Amino acid sequence: MVHYNFLSLIIFACFFAVFVLLVRAQDQSGFVSIDCGIPEDSSYNDETTDIKYVSDAAFVESGTIHSIDPEFQTSSLEKQFQNVRSFPEGNRNCYDVKPPQGKGFKYLIRTRFMYGNYDNLGKAPDFDLYLGFNIWDSVTIDNATTIVTKEIIHTLRSDHVHVCLVDKNRGTPFLSALEIRLLKSNTYETPYDSLILFKRWDLGGLGALPVRYKDDVFDRIWIPLRFPKYTIFNASLTIDSNNNEGFQPARFVMNTATSPEDLSQDIIFSWEPKDPTWKYFVYMHFAEVVELPSNETREFKVLLNEKEINMSSFSPRYLYTDTLFVQNPVSGPKLEFRLQQTPRSTLPPIINAIETYRVNEFLQSPTDQQDVDAIMRIKSKYGVKKSWLGDPCAPVKYPWKDINCSYVDNESPRIISVNLSSSGLTGEIDAAFSNLTLLHILDLSNNSLTGKIPDFLGNLHNLTELNLEGNKLSGAIPVKLLERSNKKLILLRIDGNPDLCVSASCQISDEKTKKNVYIIPLVASVVGVLGLVLAIALFLLYKKRHRRGGSGGVRAGPLDTTKRYYKYSEVVKVTNNFERVLGQGGFGKVYHGVLNDDQVAVKILSESSAQGYKEFRAEVELLLRVHHKNLTALIGYCHEGKKMALIYEFMANGTLGDYLSGEKSYVLSWEERLQISLDAAQGLEYLHNGCKPPIVQRDVKPANILINEKLQAKIADFGLSRSVALDGNNQDTTAVAGTIGYLDPEYHLTQKLSEKSDIYSFGVVLLEVVSGQPVIARSRTTAENIHITDRVDLMLSTGDIRGIVDPKLGERFDAGSAWKITEVAMACASSSSKNRPTMSHVVAELKESVSRARAGGGSGASSVTDPAMTNFDSGMFPQAR
């Protein structure tokens, strides 16, 4: 009886376990499945997976829907590929999906594409894919039947998933399907928010089709892969993968494994990344599918580029899944993972499945949340039809239509301009506009807005232009707004509002009723307040005079960078009649000054200057609109006839050129050199990517990189700077300007300016920073002048980084970062602009090198390789050796 009850209990437990697994396999509560291009409000359950797909109409506000060419609508084609939504209008079009679980969770996000000649043009497109405001990947379609899948694992920082398609003028972007799957929080744990799928293979898979849901509870797609001279093993019993660290690879995948036929061979997976700086995580899934006899052993080690990555050998467990993975991301020009048989093993290595992901580091900050909430409220209130989806200000090149933003350092972008003219707006001016506190320009003209002009518009202190023409506004103009207009602090346009009263009597009449109620207590209050104000004023006056009568020391604190105009007499006073010269350049002399107890640098235009007023004006106009911690701040300027001056923040430690030339006795350490280079690179990156249109500095050199008392570097001297076209097709063929040695040879030849001209110059500066040598030096053997790029190129062939690094550093430098920075510098200084990296890439490399130097990386010289020259991806291929 006891035996019978125990047997019944076992049977019940088995049935219950199977039931739980079936229920779990059917659970789609963490799924969002969208078929792009099917009619609005339609849905269906996929015949193969039973996943419910819905129309994309509720998740996107733009685009047109199409069916693919009937020629490609075969019975075997997944239903999601039979329709598409294309986006022929606008540079950026976004899907906005709100998963039920919201932010803080980890999701697998997948986009799928099949062209199918839906437009009958026979031209497969090429476009970019963004997740929110950061680039995810590029989508290249080879032909009508090519299926492209892009997958990313991402932890949400907001409640919304924004998937955006960006037009590159290489065909119309489109999308076939968008799928979002909730993952366990303990799955794919890394310090990074996003991992892009590189490869996911079912090794030794017996089927011809990929494995996915319901076999995989997370609906990962496993591609079967088999190799010649490899044995495939198939488990006779089911592999347990449910307790596998949360990964839970599909049981069908884990039931098969592959191993070399040659018992002495290893398994090798290797690939050469397109970019050697890309970082990868690799997850290898193992299960012994054959019960081994007692005299057989399967044991192996896992090596990366011939170095062990696990401290001990590994033996897969019979019918149980284990996952081995790297704790830290790996990178390099070539990555090779080897499963190496140990001496005591009688059997070769075995593997069931492998996943490889590339780290996607999101460098762009999202738009200020208050601004986002405000503009979304405005969109909802007025039903704005402008395809306002995704981040309003990011990416930098693709802000929302009719929105302009400011981009300062690493801070969140801010909305500074909103144009809603002729947008069919009705009702009153919404209070949400008051939360756009950095707004400079607001255009609400030619709508049907009613009611009064709200008082809060007068409190937007940054607002310099307000256009309310052509509406149905009524009542009086707010007093503050009228006062600001009278003081020419704001350009106020209100024509075309017949019921709007603009006379002074309106203001008096409007305020009279309010004031009469409070007039008696107000008079009594005013007397008391005036007395208090007078007392405070006298106290502050005393304090100010007392401070001035003290030591007279000059503060080293932060400056007030509010730009203002100064009279020439004030400039004379600031410089104490031009007492102390700090330096001299083509513009004129630079003098030391004191302004409001702060040190400043005052650049005076020489009347004999060859640069003159044009460069003066260019620098003033540029510095008035750009703000970044690595660009010198303009405090003010003077222009009285031929007398012109620029007042900057004071940079106590001179220029980078002073240190490299030996003019200063202090020798910059290796870490200080890297940090100064990073500072300068960040300043240039802001000019190139944070300004719209991009700005080219045109004269990047050590003398134009200033250093403050904290050894923080800032780019200076913008008199030669120019804006260039956003699309990169700049046709500026003005006279070539710059400094010999740093001047881009391609720009000098073609006279066509682009950001890559700055990158060339910065590469030369980097070589000077690394070597401590001048840009042009005379050869000891031929007595000819040799450029630093030629000298370094020659020394690279020796394979000894010590021959390149500044000898004043001795052995006090990190060889790994020295190699990296030298390679980056040489790539920047390539004679062809096409081979030069972007400043964003340079900044990323420098950040990594700074981190390495601070962590005390090894100082030994590495072998001579040039990862920057690796420009292909050979895929990831297993080999038996």
Curated annotation (Swiss-Prot):
Record has Kinase as a keyword: yes
Annotated spans, Disordered: 851-881
SUPFAM superfamilies: L domain-like (SSF52058), Protein kinase-like (PK-like) (SSF56112)
SMART domains in the record: S_TKc
Ranges in the topological domain labelled Cytoplasmic: 540-881
Membrane-crossing segments per the record: 519-539
PTM annotation (Phosphotyrosine): residues: 648, 747
The enzyme's E.C. designation: 2.7.11.1
Protein name: Putative leucine-rich repeat receptor-like protein kinase At2g19210
Residues on Extracellular side: 26-518
EC class: transferase
Domain Protein kinase, residue spans: 576-850
Residues with Phosphothreonine modification: 734, 739
One Gene Ontology CC term in the entry: plasma membrane
Main location: membrane
Keywords noted in UniProt: ATP-binding, Cell membrane, Glycoprotein, Kinase, Leucine-rich repeat, Membrane, Nucleotide-binding, Phosphoprotein, Receptor, Repeat, Serine/threonine-protein kinase, Signal, Transferase, Transmembrane, Transmembrane helix
Active site location: 699
Gene3D superfamilies in the record: Phosphorylase Kinase, domain 1, Ribonuclease Inhibitor, Transferase(Phosphotransferase) domain 1
Residues listed as glycosylation sites in the UniProt record: 143, 234, 295, 310, 404, 419, 435, 446, 462
Reaction equation(s) it catalyzes: L-seryl-[protein] + ATP = O-phospho-L-seryl-[protein] + ADP + H(+); L-threonyl-[protein] + ATP = O-phospho-L-threonyl-[protein] + ADP + H(+)
Membrane topology recorded in Swiss-Prot or TrEMBL: Single-pass type I membrane protein
A Gene Ontology molecular function term of the record: protein serine/threonine kinase activity
Binding site for ATP: 582-590, 603
